């Protein structure tokens, strides 16, 4: 697969002296096509650059993997990994299986937990570089792609945490590469492979299905519609549906709880933005200086008869997320592919302007490095606060509650040791008999998962919660006494006759809504907790 200029339509190859003419005359009028001369993945300079870039990316993420603490969702997924199932209230099953595999292979230390997301980040950079190379890009296009992807704030953030978001861009880019190749050079075997990738990707996040549908719609509206409306598409859909079916069946059996989570989050939690702001926020999401790259990639795709469908798919995806009031970063996994196409266009457009090439890559790298401490744990907390003040940057409001001193992705990694210590002090007030059958009731899954994971060192009772999957795990029996953290007093008084306030959980760096939480010891239940449990359900 290579990108050629308009001269290629007349049979003139873009090599040697003709390459200079092609770059100057028609670099933006690109057709992407596969032929016998497509570059192989031999150890050429571009391919060596790909593997070097992947290793550097992995090393970068591993260097900062233990600076703060376990993130809220990581702790939750550890709990899910100990209760493997075909589905969960708020996510498909793959992430729990991946976390379980990570725990078995590497252990449960913070550094060990961050190995797989670092590898995923390196894999994304490598696949982006290889995609640029297969489009006909040389070492420069490959390098620009890898730098742009590796230092994009979104990719830096998701690559530093073991959540499903670490793998989502890799699934999306893999689908882009496969469909790109299928449009150029149809092969029967690719359709089942596409279905396999979409199906497994949907077990990671349902958004994979949304991207696949956007691609199908985009291709159907493009001149290349005949390349997708073939029997192979039905085969791909059948494979994808078969793989995703167990999770769909689990959701159906439990009353579609994930839809309740999405609906409640839209009504009660998510920060809604206008369509204009949604579009504007795409620029800083992937590094402001990368915006010309992915915009150039979109323009190049629109001019391509074969691949205009990819640009149309992007438009469909953006419109859909705006209509559904999705978060601004929900379309971010599509950008690595667009950056690769834009990097090839940049390489051809600047063939005779080496100074512009050097300046562009230096500017993208410098901007990415400057933003990096705000996206991934690269600085100790005091230094981070000073860096934010120096840049006059405040934490971005991602949900409809007050922001804290640090960005939410960092706040959710802090305060867990203090929470566990607070719970331990409250449990110490229980009698030996009470402690033998006690539980710790929390207001959300992050608190419950933190106590379950970190509480082992103090032999704390199990955590229970009505939040998301913890609700389905139930009250874990009847309890003579309950330590309640972050649960409204009005809720507790409906269930318990004796309620004693014994402390308060505070942490300077967590979100304000998660600090200054009263701690109660509750005794003398009015009814068995199993009967009251349904009143604690909180799908959000």
PLM features: what roles do these ranges have?
Residues 31-39, 47-51, 128-151, 170:
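Transmembrane-helix signature of polytopic, membrane-embedded enzymes
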Residues 51, 115-136, 174, 178:
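Transmembrane-helix motifs of polytopic, lipid-linked glycan transferases
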Residues 83, 146, 178, 190-205, ...:
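Membrane-interface alpha helices of multi-pass inner-membrane proteins
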Residues 93-97, 107-126, 143, 158-162:
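Loop-to-helix entry region of an early transmembrane alpha helix in multi-pass inner-membrane enzymes
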Residues 133-139, 175-191, 296-305:
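Membrane-interface transmembrane helices that cradle and orient dolichyl/undecaprenyl
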Residues 154, 160-168:
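Short acidic/glycine- and proline-prone juxtamembrane loop motifs at membrane-interface regions
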Residues 200, 209-307, 321, 374-378:
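Transmembrane-lumen/periplasm boundary regions of multi-pass, lipid-linked membrane glycan transferases
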């Amino acid at each position: 697969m290579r990108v050629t200029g308009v001269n290629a339509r007349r049979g003139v190859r873009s090599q040697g002296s003709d390459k200079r003419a092609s770059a100057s005359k028609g670099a933006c009028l690109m057709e992407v096509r596969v032929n016998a001369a497509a570059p192989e993945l031999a150890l050429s300079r571009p391919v060596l650059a790909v593997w070097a870039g992947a290793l550097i990316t992995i090393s970068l993420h591993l260097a900062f993997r233990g600076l703060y603490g376990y993130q809220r969702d990581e702790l939750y997924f550890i709990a899910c990994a100990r209760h493997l199932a075909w589905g969960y209230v708020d996510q498909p099953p793959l992430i729990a299986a991946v976390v379980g595999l990570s725990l078995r292979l590497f252990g449960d230390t913070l550094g060990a937990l961050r190995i797989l997301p670092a590898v995923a980040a390196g894999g994304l950079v490598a696949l982006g570089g290889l995609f640029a190379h297969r489009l006909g890009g040389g070492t420069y296009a490959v390098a620009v792609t890898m730098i742009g992807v590796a230092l994009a704030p979104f990719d830096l953030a998701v690559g530093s945490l073991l959540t499903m978001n670490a793998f989502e861009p890799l699934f999306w880019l893999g689908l882009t590469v496969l469909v790109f190749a299928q449009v150029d050079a149809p092969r029967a075997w690719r359709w089942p492979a596409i279905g396999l990738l979409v199906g497994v990707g949907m077990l990671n996040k349902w958004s994979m299905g949304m991207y696949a549908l956007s691609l199908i719609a985009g291709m159907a509206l493009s001149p290349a519609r005949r390349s997708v409306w073939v029997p192979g598409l039905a085969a791909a859909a059948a494979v994808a549906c078969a793989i995703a079916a167990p999770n769909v069946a689990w959701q159906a059996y439990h009353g579609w709880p994930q839809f309740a989570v999405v609906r409640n989050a839209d009504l009660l939690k998510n920060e809604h933005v206008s369509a204009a702001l949604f579009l504007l926020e795409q620029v800083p999401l992937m590094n402001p200086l990368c915006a010309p790259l992915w915009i150039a990639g979109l323009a190049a795709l629109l001019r391509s008869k074969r691949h205009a469908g990819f640009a149309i798919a992007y438009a469909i995806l953006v419109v859909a997320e705006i209509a559904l009031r999705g978060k601004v970063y929900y379309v971010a996994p599509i950008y690595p592919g667009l950056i690769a196409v834009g990097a090839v266009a940049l390489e051809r457009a600047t063939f005779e302007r080496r100074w512009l090439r050097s300046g562009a890559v230096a500017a993208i790298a410098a901007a990415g490095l400057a933003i990096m401490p705000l996206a991934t744990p690269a600085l100790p907390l005091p230094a981070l606060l000073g860096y934010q003040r120096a840049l006059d940057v405040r934490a971005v409001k991602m949900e409809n509650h007050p922001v804290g001193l640090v960005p939410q992705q960092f706040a959710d990694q802090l305060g867990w040791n203090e929470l566990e210590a607070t719970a331990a002090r409250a449990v110490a007030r229980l009698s030996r008999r009470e402690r033998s059958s006690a539980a710790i009731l929390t207001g959300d899954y992050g608190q419950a998962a933190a106590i379950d994971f970190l509480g082992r060192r103090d032999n704390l009772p199990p955590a229970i919660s009505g939040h998301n999957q913890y609700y389905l795990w139930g009250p874990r029996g009847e309890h003579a006494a309950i330590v309640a953290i972050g649960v409204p007093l009005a809720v507790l008084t409906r269930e318990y006759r004796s309620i004693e306030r014994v402390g308060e959980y505070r942490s300077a760096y967590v979100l304000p809504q998660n600090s200054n939480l009263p701690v109660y010891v509750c005794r003398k239940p009015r009814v068995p907790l199993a009967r009251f449990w349904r009143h604690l359900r909180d799908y959000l």
